[in-house]
Amino acid sequence: MPVNGGNIGPRNLPSLSVASGVWSISDAQIYHGVSLFPVFALVAPTSVDYLVVAGGGGAGGRAGGGGGAGGFLTSTGFAISGSFTVTVGAGGAASETNAGAGAVGSNSVFSTITSTGGGGGGGEGTNPTVGGSGGGGTPGGSAGASATASPAQGNAGGNGLSAFAAGGGGGAGAVGGNGSYPGGYLGGNGGAGTASSITGTSVTYAGGGAGGDGGFSTATGGAGGGGNEGTAGTVNTGGGGGGAFYHDPLGVGDGGSGVVILKYADTSADLTTIGGGLTYTLTTSGGFKVYKFTAGTGTVTI
């Protein structure tokens, strides 16, 4: 009786044999000396998107004006080739004397693009200084300093009022607030900064520092790293330093350092060389390479 299942017919055995030894691509696989399996090298980028933020200005002396934010410049499709300079601006120091103005922040540079450092806040006897954004007016009642950089990179600082209410530093997105007296001396808030999504995440930069006063206020720094009263601007935002309460220690509201960010398609090669004086990170995400320079100066080659 036949049994279902099993194999019918001769066994099918593999007949392919492989020679031992070293294998190589045959002449038939090469056309005019070019392998049919080429390795493609990435080419250098020809344009980049950039964000360049300068260092924020320092706050003025006791109850002094808030520091102005560092200049804010950004654009897309900037043509680039060869070598260029990158510099990340430092924040300006807060005044160490009652009457002194805060120091101006340092410029940040990318190739031919220069963002201007933020203006220093005014002190008891010294007017604020101009910058990417202007410093806040003195507690003696001076006007806030203007934003003089060209192209426009920020806004003016707020005006001071009487002896104990200084103006807030200007921000990239708004002027600094004025000092006021609604039943007590109040320093002006720092001007708001401006948001950028160049890294793939929205981050606000270049807020102005808060104006100082006689001790009754809770003035705040502008969004984007501006220092609250008696507080330094945030590192790598270009935020202005916050003016202190009248009886607080001097020199506490330094400006925040700036930042330089470059972005291009990840189908292009990495930057060839980056000067040893620069501190940076490289991230690749969403189809882009993003170089973030956070300190120093040096030459970069595409």
Q: Can you say where each PLM-predicted feature lies in the sequence?
A:
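Low-complexity repetitive segments in secreted/extracellular proteins
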Residues: P2, F40-A41
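Extended Gly/Ser/Thr-rich low-complexity repeat segments
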Residues: D27-Q29, A41, V300-I302
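Low-complexity, glycine/proline-biased repetitive segments and flexible coils/loops
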Residues: P2-W23, T46-I302
